[in-house]
């Protein structure tokens, strides 16, 4: 007969285990130089199906292909499992080098931000198997359903804008190595059906594109969240802000139903400059959309997500000042994203081209 240990012994053992788990969680979230919460609760996908652990992962190192594999297969594929094992052992992964480089320069990286905002999910780590397999739980979604877009921004290309297709043919003499409009998934409803299986766990959606405001899938998600009354789910957008309606739907009315909505408008300049930099922009419509948004959904967070490069580096601060003075944004509602590609539009080549007589304008 096997005797059970005294209850007090069991309690002490359980308490010790809990203390160890809490200490381990602190080590991972605060002390580790490689751990990131995202590989335990998230996947990112390009419109062509390439899957990554997040949107900031290094392009040459995808972890799967959602046009051939399911979300579950990618989530617990060899590359994701290896990444988790490395993170748990405080070893860095080559696909995460962008975050490591930012941290070396003193920036608050996506890795650090994810550990801060999703750190409450760290108990998921305790179920990780020795080979890195983890429970398939999708808390944060960032699937770029399509490259469908109503614009052709100078700093973009065919992978993220269907409107770039004809320009690419004119510039190169041949079509891109993919369809004009790409859609992620193994079939028409494949991604949607997989999402529904994990919908109940969702904490956050990030919508980008292409242009999410003109994508059918975007509204399908919002309507499903509305049907389930999941208004606590955080919605984050990156949009060119040219459109605020789709068919008979006013997106402002949908946003008003949710507790937390944050709109990052991709605007790099104003007036004629804006229309030059982002082909398809009608500036008066951008201004009208912002004014209507302030009136219709004033509680929705709005900020400008500006890509700063060679073309706008000397006047982007003028744009910020103008919109602040007009009351269209608050001074802090302006993010500067340094352009990395294409390299001939990078801001740092200015130093080899001109003598800066007014360095404060940078």
Which stretches of residues belong to each language-model region?
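Single conserved hydrophobic/aromatic residue that forms the stacking wall/gate
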Residues: 1-20, 354-362
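Processing junctions and N-termini across compartments
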Residues: 10, 30, 89-93, 143, ...
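Accessory C-terminal segments flanking Radical SAM cores
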Residues: 22-117, 137, 340-353, 357
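Short microdomains enriched in Cys/His and/or Lys/Arg
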Residues: 74, 116-131, 169-191
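Short pre-active-site segment immediately N-terminal to redox-active cysteine/selenocysteine motifs
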Residues: 95, 103, 148-152, 157-160
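Recognition helices and adjacent regulatory flanks at domain boundaries
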Residues: 105-140, 149-151, 172
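Core AdoMet radical
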Residues: 138-148, 157-187, 199-217, 228-247, ...
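Catalytic cores of alpha/beta
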Residues: 311-324
